[in-house]
Swiss-Prot record:
GO terms for biological process: behavioral response to nicotine; nervous system development; signal transduction; synaptic transmission involved in micturition. It comes from Carassius auratus (Goldfish). It is found in: Synaptic cell membrane; Cell membrane; Endoplasmic reticulum; Golgi apparatus. Component of neuronal acetylcholine receptors (nAChRs) that function as pentameric, ligand-gated cation channels with high calcium permeability among other activities. nAChRs are excitatory neurotrasnmitter receptors formed by a collection of nAChR subunits known to mediate synaptic transmission in the nervous system and the neuromuscular junction. Each nAchR subunit confers differential attributes to channel properties, including activation, deactivation and desensitization kinetics, pH sensitivity, cation permeability, and binding to allosteric modulators. Keywords: Cell membrane, Disulfide bond, Endoplasmic reticulum, Glycoprotein, Golgi apparatus, Ion channel, Ion transport, Ligand-gated ion channel, Membrane, Metal-binding, Receptor, Signal, Sodium, Synapse, Transmembrane, Transmembrane helix, Transport. Expressed in retina and brain. This is Neuronal acetylcholine receptor subunit alpha-3. GO terms for cellular component: acetylcholine-gated channel complex; endoplasmic reticulum; Golgi apparatus; postsynaptic membrane. NCBIfam families: LIC. Residues 356-389 are annotated as: Disordered. Activated by a myriad of ligands such as acetylcholine, cytisine, nicotine, choline and epibatidine. The heteropentamer CHRNA3:CHRNB2 activity is blocked by alpha-conotoxins ImI, ImII, PnIA, GID and MII. The heteropentamer CHRNA3:CHRNB4 activity is blocked by the alpha-conotoxin ImI and AuIB. Pfam families: Neur_chan_LBD (PF02931), Neur_chan_memb (PF02932).
Amino acid sequence: MNSASRITLFFLLTVLITQECLSSKGEDRLFRRLFRRYNQFIRPVENVSDPVTVEFEVSISQLVKVDEVNQIMETNLWLRHIWNDYKLKWLPAEFDGIEFIRVPSNKIWRPDIVLYNNAVGDFLVEDKTKALLKYDGTITWVPPAIFKSSCPMDITYFPFDYQNCSMKFGSWTYDKAKIDLVLIGSKVNLKDFWESGEWEIIDAPGYKHDIKYNCCEEIYPDITYSFYIRRLPLFYTINLIIPCLLISFLTILVFYLPSDCGEKVTLCISVLLSLTVFLLVITETIPSTSLVIPLIGEYLLFTMIFVTLSIVITVFVLNVHYRTPMTHTMPSWVRTVFLRALPRVMLMRRPIDLSESSGKGGGEIAGSSGTGGGRGAEGKKMKSSASQQGAMNSLEFGEGKAALEGKKGGCPCHPIKEAIEGDCGKVSRQLTPQAINTVVTFSVVSPEIKQAIESVKYIAENMRSRNKAKEVEDDWKYVAMVIDRIFLWVFVLVCVLGTLGLFLQPLIGFFS
């Protein structure tokens, strides 16, 4: 570095140091002059009857918390106060051109503006921040403060709720004749607002009021800011509403599960237990208040009733499903309603037994073993045809007897054997009680054959009774299936309409 550069650098440093010293001395002289005889307890007015005009503005930095249980809104605010103090004026030319000076706020007179609806903490802001003083006496004081204001909340539509929280600022001791508040702007300053993850500020207008209280004759001005906030429902939708919807649809699946699997009640109890555990987990999330029932609370109660009714109905369906002819007799109206009318309405088609569809003109066994949905007129027709066929069998075996008696010569056993062998196909095809009785009555057979025929008759009667019992059991099972299908659609409609009805209420209330 050459000598010229060194001289230039030294000259600049000297000028800066000298100017700083002069500025410090000028500011010190100004401070001593301003506060030599200043009294911070006296209102800064030349005429005692004149009010001090205080311009007031609120800037919100952060919406810290909204406590629904205690009904408190916690905010971080910057309060801008602007007023003029005639005793704090100076000429900048006399003090090295100083136009602004920062002074401790406890050294000057300050308006005692407090938050009227403060819930917790101090009503006054702290005086640790400095005030900006201008040469013409204008004072700007912007103290930051964290307020916990009381806010009556309506959580009826939680978590889709809107809240209106007000903050009322005003002088606590000075009436309008002493301090006149002027609102800066028409709403809260949101330029430095940090977005909250739970709440959104829709609007925050400000209003000035002049109120006469019962305690005093004077009129007191105040500035009230109304914070219109909306809860962001994404967190509650994912953690509350969607699990409840899934549990509700699991309840619907109970009615689609077949009764024979034996897991219907198990599924119902599992859904109820899962809902109970879920309610225990989210108890701290839901606002615990007895003033109103929140929307999510109504939906959880709706889901609980939903699951409980599904258990009751499932027990009833299982009771119907496992009924037998030995314990219950099916009334005719049940057969008409649940076996004929309702299946058509519910678009249910009962499969027809193959034996019935393949041999409609067969014997009584085939007719009685069919599992078709309608057993009224068709069953009667089958029974009448079976009785006619029994009479035909009697006639046929009667002719066989006459033929046997018409035989002459030889052992009587041979004609009997031939007659039996000749009619064997008919007996095997139409094994009815009439046919068996005809064989036993009009045939001269050995005791062994009679015993065999009686055994066949017993087996046929047993098979017939079992088939009839099986038919009745199948009818009861089909009735249970119809009831299941009815409640399946009923629960689907109730679940969809109930969900839409509950969660459309906030939207309807907002537009109304």
